[in-house]
Amino acid sequence: ELNPQSKIYCNKNEIDEVKIKFNIKAEEKNYIIAPSASGPTKRWGVNNYIKLLEELNKTYSSKFFIAGGKDDETLIKNIIDSSIGKNCISLSNKSVAEIIPIMAACNYAICNDTGFAHLASGLGLKCLVLFMDSPPIAYGTYSKNISIIVPEGESIESCGHNTKGKDKILFKEVLDKSLKLVN
């Protein structure tokens, strides 16, 4: 029988090194946050992410690693320059090979539908993935590590390319499912 659950392995020594380098502590909630995506219709607003991170940090002492590439630096800077920025570390200047052990040292990921969500899932993180303009039935249901959010009025089956639902992702649903993820 074929197991569709992907699994990515990371060297334990590399994970231990990044835990020391980035002061990743077990008593904190450590998240990978991926606020970017391949296009603007697949991105939940950066201000929503800022508000979400603030709320999560009120509930649990948290550290947020903001994943993205060079093209995402302005987006990430908005988060770093916000009131929650002191709890955030940008990964935009790192290669995927450098980011993977950092991801493996974390427990949770909250992402738009992007490659970082799938890497986090493969590393065994509990993931909340926001699908707003792509089909979660194709890209999100393969993994037990992925919890899915779709726009209000859509379902896992109906959400797809051209849904253009980024403004219909409900903040309360994302917050509630984020809190459920860590419990």
Task: Show which residues each predicted segment covers.
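Mid-sequence helix-capping/hinge segment at a functional interface
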Residues: E1-K42, V46
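A short acidic, often aromatic-flanked loop/helix-cap motif at beta-alpha or helix-coil junctions
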Residues: C10-K12, V96-I99, G153-S158
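Short, glycine/serine-rich, charged loops/turns that create anion-binding
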Residues: A37-S38, D71, S134-P135
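Short, basic/glycine-rich phosphate-binding loops at helix/coil junctions
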Residues: E1-L2, N30-I33, N78, E152-S158
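Donor-binding and catalytic core of enzymes assembling or modifying cell-surface/extracellular glycoconjugates
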Residues: G45-M132
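Nucleotide-sugar donor-binding patch of glycosyltransferase catalytic domains
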Residues: S90, H118-N183
